[in-house]
Amino acid sequence: MGRSISLPLVATLTISLTACTSQTIRPEEYSGFLHDYSQLTEKKLPSGKKVLAWVSPTLHTHPYTRVYIEPSLFYPEMLPTERAPQSTLSAVTHYYDTALKHELGKVMTVVETPGPDTLIIRSSIISVAARTQSLRFYEWLPVTLLAAGVSTATGIRDQDSEITTEVAVLDAVDQAVVAQIVRKETGRPLDNDKQVMTLDDFKPVLDGWAFDMRQAYSSGGK
């Protein structure tokens, strides 16, 4: 008679995998880059994506016509690893800045120096990571569940690249914070736990963040 996998074990695996695949930012994951996280609430962007954000009522009462993009950075400082080398980290922040300038430049004038009627975009990358993908439906069958466990243990299961950002938007004159955003998203899938992550794994996410910021500003932050 074949051995069966106990229901408690399956339940435990289910809970564990669900926790690993969640894209919700928990308070303990906040980096400290933003001054105040207490007013963040879940908001649905025009693109349909959900993020944690706060927008001051004064943001769209002031005629901001210009935007200054501060160079983005890793916060806290992220040391390069074999899977996330310095070349990837540098490329990610540079591309993030370029994408923001490209999208926001469609609705505002991008300037090299902050001044009157200017918004400052102060962005950070707080994590770049890889996580093992959750089990697919067919892998919950008893035999394939065991096989999936072996694949995970040997490091051959597919993984997801993952990146998180925190952004503060400030008035350039008085440095008052007028908006804050925190979001985590999944990039391109990785073949295994040895694959080196590159900029290409995160480009769609970075493009999406910049696009959403432009759309949110154009829609009045609603």
Predicted features along the sequence, with ranges:
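Bacterial N-terminal signal peptides that target proteins for export
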Residues: M1-L9
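C-terminal motif of bacterial Sec signal peptides marking the signal peptidase cleavage site
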Residues: S16-A19
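C-terminal/domain-edge helix-coil "capping" segments
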Residues: T21-S56, G155-T164, A168-K222
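Soluble periplasmic/extracytoplasmic beta-strand elements of cell-envelope proteins
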Residues: A53, R66-L73, T118-I126, E166-A168, ...
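N-terminal segment of the mature soluble domain
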Residues: T58-R122
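Solvent-exposed loop/turn segments at secondary-structure junctions
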Residues: F74-E77, S127-R131, E185-R188
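A solvent-exposed, charged loop/short amphipathic helix patch at secondary-structure junctions
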Residues: P80-V92, V143-V150, L190-K194
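Surface-exposed short loop/turn segments
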Residues: H102, K106-V173
